[in-house]
Amino acid sequence: MGKWEINDYSEAVKWLKTKSFIDSTKIGITGGSYGGYVTCMALTLGADYFTHGLAEYSVTDWGLYDNVYTERYMDLPAENKEGYKFGSAMTHAKDYKGLLRITHGTLDDNVHMQNTLQLIDKFTSMNKHFELMLYPNERHGVGFPKWVHAQTEYVRFWYKNFLGKDFVNE
């Protein structure tokens, strides 16, 4: 997983960059769960195309995810070592540039927080800048009332990085 998704998104970004109204220094992507995985891969494997990402409760290594789901698409790890390696954001972390904000609930029982911890460990070992927001006692997604904070910070991220403005929270 990861190869064709990033190929498709990168081709779309190449096309967008041909448009005069596109600022190629501000190409963002966001998603949660599998979308968070794609976001992490876009800022690593696709780092030449994407400048900003907001990844929520993301799979970063398919070896850490539910084997019933993963093996349906990737076969057994022993039968597809290269696929599992290529599909891990950790494999491409060396190519990371831009700005990635990672969010995760500490009680996520779907995509375990170990995914986030391994990626940020890799980034910090390489002295890469990123942003991290953890939500204590939240699961796979942030529920109310913390959802209000999560959404406010989500909007603040885009205001600051794409509009160069502070988001006024009233």
Task: Please report, for each region that a protein language model flagged, where it lies by residue.
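Active-site-proximal cap/loop segments of hydrolase catalytic domains
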Residues: 1-170
